[in-house]
Amino acid sequence: MGSLSSRGKTSSPSPSSSGPDQEPVSMQPERHKVTAVALGSFPAGEQARLSLRLGEPLTIISEDGDWWTVQSEVSGREYHMPSVYVAKVAHGWLYEGLSREKAEELLLLPGNPGGAFLIRESQTRRGCYSLSVRLSRPASWDRIRHYRIQRLDNGWLYISPRLTFPSLHALVEHYSELADGICCPLREPCVLQKLGPLPGKDTPPPVTVPTSSLNWKKLDRSLLFLEAPASGEASLLSEGLRESLSSYISLAEDPLDDA
């Protein structure tokens, strides 16, 4: 739980226990395995079944400058790809290398309910973060709300100055219990897309069009005036076409009959 400085409670730790360079949360909870998420389809232009998709969970195998080797936790395939297509994920909700726009795309993926959230490291303000939350509205489209998480000189964090926290874990725990000024309580971390079909248009089954046995060049005029076939039998001519052809022939033959 955070501390309420407005109520006279201590809002910061002692100077010896914290400093301006304190890192509230490490991005590497497990040395042997670094979890990440795909930020888009890769490689572009490949068949859907071979491509990564937005939100697909990954394991980072190696990092070589701007090119990383990752393995999909869905298909097991390995990819050597630019790091801009990947964001690291720690604790299920802390993202490194994620923009505001991509945060919105991830949270709006199917499977994320209202209250789904993630925290991303600021790409412009060192040591600061942003909280992104999916807000469900019954009479309208869901939207994403963003809240800047500021950092004090002593390392403590806050969204509202009246309420400070020693760590991101404490902040998440507090706002999971009550909204306390944000759009809604935090419900669960953004869901990684482990299930469901890969992206790409579903190809509908081919439509079978029966081939007509009617030969227009050898059409007998008497066929136009036959009664409709019994139920279940194929018809050479539809009722509408039969009537149209009959009317045309009648009109074409009338002048000859009057001559």
UniProtKB/Swiss-Prot annotation:
- Region (SLA C-terminal) residue ranges read 190-259
Q: What GO MF annotations does this protein's record show?
A: signaling adaptor activity
- Write down a Pfam family by its short name: SH2
Annotated ranges, domain SH2: 93-190
Q: Where is this protein found?
A: Cytoplasm; Cell membrane; Cytoplasmic vesicle; Late endosome
Cite the record's tissue specificity text.
Mainly expressed in immune system. Highly expressed in spleen and thymus and expressed at intermediate levels in lung. Not expressed in liver, heart and brain. Isoform 1 is predominant in lung and spleen, while isoform 2 is predominant in thymus.
Q: Where is the composition biased (Low complexity)?
A: 1-20
State the disulfide connectivity.
none
The portions of this protein that span the membrane are: none
Domain SH3: where? 31-91
- Spell out where lipidation (N-myristoyl glycine) occurs: G2
The UniProt entry, under SUPFAM superfamilies, shows: SH2 domain (SSF55550), SH3-domain (SSF50044)
A Gene Ontology biological process noted in the UniProt record is:
negative regulation of transcription by RNA polymerase II
One GO term describing the cellular component: plasma membrane
User: What are the boundaries of the region Disordered?
Assistant: 1-30
What does altering M27V do? Abolishes isoform 2
Q: How is it modified after translation?
A: Phosphorylated by CSF1R.
Which PANTHER family does this chain map to?
PROTEIN ENHANCER OF SEVENLESS 2B
Q: What else is known?
A: PubMed:12024036 confirmed the alternative initiation by mutating the Met in position 1 to Val, and showed that isoform 1 is abolished in favor of isoform 2.
The entry describes its oligomerization and partners as: Interacts (via its C-terminal domain) with CBL (phosphorylated). Interacts (via SH2 domain) with ZAP70 (phosphorylated) and CD3Z (phosphorylated). Interacts (via SH2 domain) with CSF1R (phosphorylated).
Note what the entry says on domains: The loss of the C-terminal domain partially abolishes the inhibitory function.
- Physiological role: Adapter protein, which negatively regulates T-cell receptor (TCR) signaling. Inhibits T-cell antigen-receptor induced activation of nuclear factor of activated T-cells. May act by linking signaling proteins such as ZAP70 with CBL, leading to a CBL dependent degradation of signaling proteins.
**Annotated protein name in UniProt:** Src-like-adapter 2
> What is the species listed in this Swiss-Prot or TrEMBL entry?
Mus musculus
